[in-house]
Amino acid sequence: DGGAESEIEYENFNAVRADVDFKGFNIHPGSAKNTMINAALVAMEFDRMLPAGETPRDTEGYEGFYHLNHMSGNVEKANLNYILRDHDADNIAKRQEIMKEITAKLNEKYGADTVSLTLKEEYRNMAEKIKPNFHLIENAKKAVQKSGVEPQVIPVRGGTDGARLSFMGLPCPNLGTGSYACHGPYEHTTAEGMDIVVDTLTELVRLYGEMK
């Protein structure tokens, strides 16, 4: 599900979607003193209250983040859509708690139901399903080496199709496909890279065919 032909990945993000809705109160701005609640401004305040320096631009490796994916709004109503990501299960839980605390503080400041937060789990870190079946990683490393490149076992800063499959009973680490710059306008692969991937897969089949 993406990645350089040398990559082997069995750790992915725990993923949560957060939808934050803001309800404002509109009135003529000339007589708005202590009365108007601008939903768009409350939304901006919510975002400022999140921990600084924890966005995709600021993080790498095992560092998690809050990613503001979409925003819309006016005085009367606004919406912020975030994705929350973290490899560590405790940390993803803490990120959700922080959002709940911010919601409570803003509702205390502006009135009940000004801010409503909806959290939804999207997928989990497949490491807990792969580690008991670590032969998958050891054989993948052998197969990549046999294809002529040095294997790189790295954490996925995202999710993979294999993450869902792993929790459905089919432990499924991610193997690189020889693709680069994924999800952008310059996403590409090479014929040479695809040849290496085919060699890797062929070797994997051979290795498992010899297992008894």
Spans of model-derived segments:
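A common structural junction motif
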Residues: 54, 100-110
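Zn-dependent metallopeptidase/amidohydrolase metal-coordination segment
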Residues: 76, 150-200
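Conserved active-site and cofactor/substrate-binding residues in soluble primary-metabolism enzymes
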Residues: 34-45, 63, 87-90, 94-101, ...
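Conserved short beta-strand edge segments in small beta-sheet-based binding/regulatory domains
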Residues: 106-120
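Midchain, well-structured core segments that form catalytic/ion-binding scaffolds
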Residues: 1-97, 122
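C-terminal alpha-helix
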Residues: 200-211
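Active-site-adjacent substrate-binding region
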Residues: 41-58, 65-67, 114, 124-172
